[in-house]
Amino acid sequence: MLQQVRFRYIAFAVATLALAATSDAAGQVTGTPRPPTKTVTPSRSQRRFRISAPDLSSRGRIALTHVYNGMGCTGQNISPALEWTNPPTGTKSFAVTAYDPDAPTGSGWWHWVMYNIPANATGLPAGAGTGRNAPRGSAQGNTDFGSKGYGGPCPPVGDPPHHYHFKVFALKVDKLDVPGNATAAMIGYNLNANKLATAEIVSLYGR
């Protein structure tokens, strides 16, 4: 009698193991099912702040349209159109600068500084550097040409192509506290002190 009970128990255990192996081999789920993975869309604050320019290309040559007219250069001196997207949350104004770190001055060369651009702006049209098409309420600082407004590339003849950094700043203040005759360096100091994010495109020019 005892032997029969043991035999039946062993037979039952073997059958159970065989059934489990068959179920696993057939690809059936034997554990607790996992919930489906959710696709998370990044918030605006997680997206990257970007700048683009229809007439400029990254590491590409700047057209004569945007080159300085003077000092031996014969361009049209029209500031390029700029566009930006995904500014960070809390942006209260924007600023735009154009700077050549390769100029043989020891401190580079400021070609353009525009600030107090309203927070609802998404870019600047071509020619905004003259002030005519600039956003209402914006201001421009003195460049290293000794005047306000855009001054295009004009590197020394024979230099390797210079790098021109067109940069947009997203700022945490709606207006910069600088005097009307502030230099580009002074404005740049205040931009870096109040920036939330920056984006830039670098283009080249040589002659």
Stretches found by the model and what they are:
Residues 25-207:
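N-terminus-centered regions that define maturation/targeting leaders and the start
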Residues 2-3, 17-18, 75, 105:
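Generic secretory/membrane-interface signal
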Residues 11-20:
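Bacterial N-terminal signal peptides
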Residues 2-11:
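Bacterial N-terminal signal peptides that target proteins for export
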